[in-house]
């Protein structure tokens, strides 16, 4: 550190050394200043004016600053850009400091650890996620610090990690330094952490300390070794940034994929669950569903959509609760009550972190006051899930009484401003306040005494925050001021003085004010500690209010949108009668054309043909969305639905270049298709829209044929497969499990008319030129296209059906299918090897 730096700059550089990767906001009077590279970066990110202060190595030191009273706005902008900030405050008294005022970092804010209400999106979880990889395993741990949730999951494939990142949308990723990351991680704010934080023994120690246990076996650590290391690194980071205990993180939730209907990253995007295809929040499934009354409910609804349940029994408890709310007509009254509730979940987190503001406590009190009314409203609803909710929203009279007696009804925003603790709560505080508040009466009395003593008629006593208390005389009478009047200030028309008696009074009053503020701050901190004992009950209350809000919202959606309860059955299959698209239907001015669908084990694929814009993709997507809605417990847009067990939803709909990874449209399409063919099972729902585009007609048709046949006959997945290759409509002749359907269209007065009805059989043409005309292709181009099409149709088909060759049956595979390996003797196994070898020789000759 250069000795030529001023003491203040030396202090800055010393503090900055501990926070090299963060922007250091260094408090100087009414501003937070930034220096050197921090100043340059902040000026670019925040459009600040870059100035200079002093010199370093004979060069001016760059400086930029923001007003302290507006700092929250600047912090919010930095967090959105993935930046982290260390707030360095003046903690010493400038009046008594020798040299620079003592300063220290009092607050660290990172994108994934922020809990301040002003810096968060109320309706989105704010996730901090750590990734660790070892031995072909990917362990992830994530925490929502504002919600008190801590989750772990073990993965085996990168595409699973991609799916979780798309679902969770973490604000910040933690990785071990020098760890290579997949390209899709570049969409997030990544922090590389030292290797020692990703240590198994260190992780075990930190987790045991956090959860006050000596062993983690109760959490199932043996099944999550990699994820536990990630969890340890995450806790180490939280301890560094929060500088305190985290009492609201009380347990680990171990995510198990078999509990949920799996949705990969492509499926989440293709179905437009959380945002539309352009990245906006409107016209997606969440935007149609989210009519929640409170922010807690909104966040929970999004979590439900991202993790649809597999267990029918749990789903049915949600259905029963919704049915009963409808029957008892409770949705409107409950919605109005919940709407008045505060964001208890995030208030609890701020209480745990001792950062709750006075108005947080008032909002919490107002929610506690509402609990008896909510509880009474639910009294008649005896369903299993509502009974569980009622247990958690019981009144908390002791906490309510504490808050009512401790905090005034309308406190200032910050405790530092004082006037937060209610009169009568603390006797010592009341005495200090009385001394301060009675100052005016004492001042009037002193003024009259001095007037009587001196005979000076213009004498007045006053006060301001700069000069303190003073005696004021007009210029005319100032010459008669007695000797014990000591001049304090000269103004144009008056002189101001201080006397020993007035100085004594000033010290007493100002001391009382200072002591009152200190006492109030101490009382407030103690109050937060006392409330912390209620964190378990308040956390349960928050979860139950959020769950009730989602159930009430799904009730309202079911009634407003004319949705019905789906039937979940143990028998395999999917049946939808008069299904509609949940997002498109509410946006249409005209009536939506409903369509039926049935898939069953012996007829598990629909081969869908029809014109572009004819409704094929809508029909496919609405099927997947109806299935997904059913698995979160929602009613669905259909007259009747019957669903058997399902494990995953896959989609391959639309494609575009992935420039960041250097992949063409065709490569993206093939990668998604390969993932489906490798992972789908007989209980998966698969949507494939147009395989084979982006390559030659022959290659494309061959790939479409093979994929279609493999899904239908080998995997036996429930599949909706749309295509423009009309030659594929011959497949049902070879595979009885495939059925042709098409979207109707007709030509009227030379114009194509889309009927949007799904009918049996295949389309007899694609209507491509008619759709091109709608798109505005010039008439001379269309005329030429018609002439060329007629020439092709008159001479030959683009691909003769006989060129699609049914895969030959292998004698070796036929023989292997007959074998039960568990029942073979050693002699039979040896004979079998010779037989298979002979068959292999025959195949090679043929």
UniProtKB/Swiss-Prot annotation:
GO CC annotations on file: cytosol
The answer to whether UniProt assigns keyword ATP-binding to this entry is yes
Pfam families for this protein: MutS_I, MutS_II, MutS_III, MutS_IV, MutS_V
Descriptive protein name: DNA mismatch repair protein MutS
What's a Gene Ontology MF term here? Answer: mismatched DNA binding
What does the sequence similarity comment in the record state about its family? Answer: Belongs to the DNA mismatch repair MutS family.
Role, per record: This protein is involved in the repair of mismatches in DNA. It is possible that it carries out the mismatch recognition step. This protein has a weak ATPase activity.
Q: What is the organism field in this record?
A: Legionella pneumophila (strain Lens)
Query: What is one process in the GO biological process aspect for this record?
Result: mismatch repair
NCBIfam families according to UniProt: mutS1, PRK05399.1
Sorted UniProt keywords = ATP-binding, DNA damage, DNA repair, DNA-binding, Nucleotide-binding
Q: Where, by residue number, does ATP bind? A: 610-617
Alphabetized PROSITE patterns for the sequence: DNA_MISMATCH_REPAIR_2
Domain of life the protein comes from: Bacteria
Q: Which InterPro entries does the record match to this protein?
A: DNA_mismatch_repair_MutS, DNA_mismatch_repair_MutS-lik_N, DNA_mismatch_repair_MutS/MSH, DNA_mismatch_repair_MutS_C, DNA_mismatch_repair_MutS_clamp, DNA_mismatch_repair_MutS_core, DNA_mismatch_repair_MutS_N, DNA_mismatch_repair_MutS_sf
């Amino acid at each position: 550190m250069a000795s030529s730096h001023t003491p203040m700059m030396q202090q800055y550089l010393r503090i900055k050394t501990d926070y090299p990767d963060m922007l250091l906001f260094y408090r100087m009077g009414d501003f937070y200043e930034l220096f050197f590279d921090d100043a340059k970066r902040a000026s670019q990110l925040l459009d600040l004016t870059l100035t200079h202060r002093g010199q370093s190595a004979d060069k001016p030191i760059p400086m930029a600053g923001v007003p302290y009273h507006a700092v929250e706005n600047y912090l919010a902008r930095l967090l959105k850009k993935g930046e982290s900030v260390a707030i360095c405050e003046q903690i010493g008294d400038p009046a008594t400091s020798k040299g620079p005022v003592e300063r220290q970092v009092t607050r660290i804010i990172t994108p994934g650890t922020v809990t301040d209400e002003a810096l968060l999106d109320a309706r989105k979880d704010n996730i901090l996620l750590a990734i660790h990889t070892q031995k072909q395993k990917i362990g992830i741990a994530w925490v929502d610090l504002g919600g008190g949730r801590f989750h772990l999951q073990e993965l085996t494939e990168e595409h699973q990690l991609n799916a979780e990142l798309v679902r969770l949308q973490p604000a910040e990723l933690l990785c071990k330094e020098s760890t290579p990351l997949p390209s899709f991680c570049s969409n997030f704010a990544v922090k590389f952490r030292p290797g020692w934080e990703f240590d198994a023994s260190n992780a075990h120690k930190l987790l045991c300390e956090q959860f006050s246990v000596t062993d983690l076996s109760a959490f199932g650590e043996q099944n999550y070794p990699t994820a536990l290391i990630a969890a340890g690194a995450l806790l180490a980071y939280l301890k560094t940034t929060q500088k305190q205990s985290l009492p609201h993180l009380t347990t680990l939730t171990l995510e198990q994929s078999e509990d949920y209907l799996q949705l990969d990253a492509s499926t989440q995007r293709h179905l437009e669950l959380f945002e539309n295809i352009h990245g906006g929040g409107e016209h997606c499934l969440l935007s149609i569903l989210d009519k929640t009354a409170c922010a807690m409910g909104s966040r929970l609804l999004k979590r439900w959509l991202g993790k649809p349940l597999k267990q029918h029994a749990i789903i049915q408890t949600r259905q029963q609760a919704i049915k009963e709310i409808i029957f008892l007509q409770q949705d409107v009254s409950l919605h109005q009550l919940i709407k008045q509730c505060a964001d208890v979940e995030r208030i609890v987190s701020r209480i745990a972190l001792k950062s709750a503001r006075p108005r947080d406590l008032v909002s919490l009190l107002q929610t506690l006051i509402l609990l008896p009314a909510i509880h009474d409203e639910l009294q008649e609803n005896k369903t299993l899930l509502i009974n569980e909710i009622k247990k958690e929203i019981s009144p908390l009279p002791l906490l309510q009484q504490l808050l009512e007696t401790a905090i005034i009804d309308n406190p200032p925003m910050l405790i530092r401003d004082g006037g937060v603790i209610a009169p009568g709560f603390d006797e010592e505080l009341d005495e200090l306040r009385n001394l301060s508040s009675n100052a005016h009466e004492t001042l009037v009395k002193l003024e009259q005494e001095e007037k009587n003593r001196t005979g000076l008629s213009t004498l007045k006593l006053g006060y301001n925050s700069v000069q303190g208390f003073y005696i004021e005389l007009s210029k005319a009478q100032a010459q008669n001021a007695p000797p014990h009047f000591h001049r304090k200030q000269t103004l144009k028309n008056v002189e101001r003085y201080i006397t020993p008696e007035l100085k004594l009074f000033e010290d007493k009053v100002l001391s009382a004010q200072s002591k009152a503020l200190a006492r109030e701050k101490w009382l407030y901190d103690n109050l937060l500690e006392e409330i912390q004992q209620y964190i378990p009950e308040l956390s349960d209350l928050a979860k139950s209010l959020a769950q009730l809000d989602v159930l009430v919202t799904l009730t309202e959606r079911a009634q407003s949108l004319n949705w019905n309860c789906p039937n979940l059955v143990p028998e395999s299959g999917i049946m939808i009668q008069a299904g509609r698209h949940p997002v498109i239907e509410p946006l249409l001015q005209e009536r939506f054309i409903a369509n039926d669908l049935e898939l069953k084990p012996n007829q598990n694929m629909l081969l869908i043909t029809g014109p572009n814009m004819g409704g094929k993709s809508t029909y496919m997507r609405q099927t997947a969305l109806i299935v997904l809605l059913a698995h979160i417990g929602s009613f669905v847009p259909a007259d009747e639905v019957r669903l058997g067990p399902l494990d995953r939803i896959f989609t391959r709909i639309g494609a575009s270049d992935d420039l960041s990874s250097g992949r063409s449209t065709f490569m993206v399409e093939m990668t998604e298709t390969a993932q489906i063919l490798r992972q789908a099972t007989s209980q998966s729902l698969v949507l494939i829209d147009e395989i084979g585009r982006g390559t030659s007609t022959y290659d494309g048709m061959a790939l479409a044929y093979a994929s279609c046949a493999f899904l239908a006959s080998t995997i036996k997945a429930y599949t909706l497969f749309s295509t423009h290759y009309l030659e594929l409509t011959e497949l049902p002749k070879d595979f009885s499990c495939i059925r042709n359907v098409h979207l109707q269209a007709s030509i009227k007065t030379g114009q194509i008319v889309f009927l949007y009805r799904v009918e049996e059989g295949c389309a007899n043409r694609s209507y491509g030129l008619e759709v091109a005309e709608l798109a505005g292709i010039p008439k001379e181009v269309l005329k030429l296209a018609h002439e060329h099409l007629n020439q092709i149709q008159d001479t030959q088909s683009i691909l003769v059906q006989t060129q699609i060759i049914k895969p030959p049956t292998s004698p070796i595979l036929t023989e292997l299918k007959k074998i039960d390996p568990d029942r073979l003797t050693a002699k039979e196994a040896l004979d079998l090897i010779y037989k298979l070898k002979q068959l292999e020789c025959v195949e090679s000759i043929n």
